[in-house]
Structure formats: structure tokens, C-alpha cells
């Protein structure tokens, strides 16, 4: 609606449900080939095509440098991230114009059947994790990490195929129904501190647009970033209250040894990928240079204001 209004109706979108034309994991291919003009997905889905996609969609452990979703957007808008993001598609050999539109993080560590006091407790459970580097990092610290699609998680928990799981954050987790099978919820995690969803448009379609239409897409995308962050903070807060006060979910603190073990493994994984891929290294170096300047202020200025 925003784009249609900004362009006076010259650009209109027909919104189709996921899977109507192709599966979610085929979205980028479909846009690239012009099967559909545009699509919506999470850029870390394409980490198998290029490891640097993870750094834009969901940089593990905040890129190993203390970046949260707000700091990530600062890097993206003003620290050189957007220019590197635009190059990603060429690195992947795709005829794509991408727009980052929906920050989602931070995601919760997850749901457990019993409290976990330390990593020894954590290692007792078969744990659903995201695919790719975040999930592999769990395996690197001895967690029985199991990747599976969202629709398979609750049946797997009920069948005992897995014991514990992560999905997203309070609002989506409540809607999903985790509280029906597990009651111990841990918010603080490192696997997906930053998560971003994107809008993709095929290059041929984008290049045929007027300058006004292109600028309208940019303005709408930037507005969406702010609206998404604002929406999720409040909605997740309401959902967390419902989980604890209505559904009897117990909010737990993540064991301290989790952070040291996961961060060390994440940094090792990032270093390995940087050694193997020059563009990955360039993007990560940019993040680290940004964090060296921004994180001391941003993390240092945070405080808990509770009466």
C-alpha cells in the first residue's frame, strides 16, 4: 500500500501466499529467473549458495562482535553494509535487487522440558536449531542439533524425536503453540541475535522502473525497517506476559557458560569462512571495523531503568 501510494498507483503488488508459485526456499531462484517479479524471504536461507548471505540475514552471535539488530541497521545504513549487500547478488550470480525490510531479532534461545543449569544440562537434549552456521555452531559445542522445518517441530516434540527447540521470539512462539508442550523458556541466546527478512525484485523489472518508482521502493523499505522494530518490541512484550501469566510458562535465565562456549565456537566458524571466501572476509571485516567504533558506545550506553 505504501509503494502504491508513493507512486500514485503506477506500482502495485499482487500478494500471494507462500508456496502459491514456488516453495519458500525456491523464492530467490524464481525471482532471478523472472518466474515471479518479486518475493519475500530471509537472506540467510541462501547461505548454502554463498556463506556471506548469513552475514546479512542472520550473522551468528552478532557477527562475533556484539552487534544487535539496531546496531546492525546502523552498520547497514551508514557503515558500508548496504553497498556490500548490493554486491552480494552479483557475487551469487543473481539478477536481483534486494531491499532489507523486516528486522526480527533477537530470537530466543528456546524451549526446554526442564530448567538447564549449565551446558552439561543442555547437552542432554536433542535440540531443534536453524540450519547452516548457527546450527553447526551448536554441534561444535556438543549439542545434539537437529534442523527441521517449522511445521515439523511440534509433532517432533510430541513424538520425542526432539526434546527442546527454538523457533523465534515470544509473539511467533505463542502463536506456534510451544507453551502447550514445553514450559521452560529462555530468552537470551546468541545463535540469531540479528535476523532480517528481505524483499527481492528481479533486475530486469527493477531496471525498467522510473527513478521515482525506484526511490519509492527505497523509502518504503526504510520505513518498514523502523515499523518492524517498533512493532516487534511491543508485541513480543505482550506475548511474553501472556505466556507467563496465562499459560504458566516459566521464564528462565540462560546459563553463563553457554555464552562463553557458543561465542568462542561462533568466532571460530566465522574465521574459517573468512579464510575460505574473500567476499565473506570483506563483509566481516566491515562489520568488525564498524563494531570497533560503535559497540563501545552502544553497549556501554545501555542500562536497565527499573524502579
Language model: regions and residue ranges:
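N-terminal secretory/targeting leader peptides
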Residues: 1-72, 90-307
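Hinge/lid segment of periplasmic solute-binding proteins
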Residues: 78-93
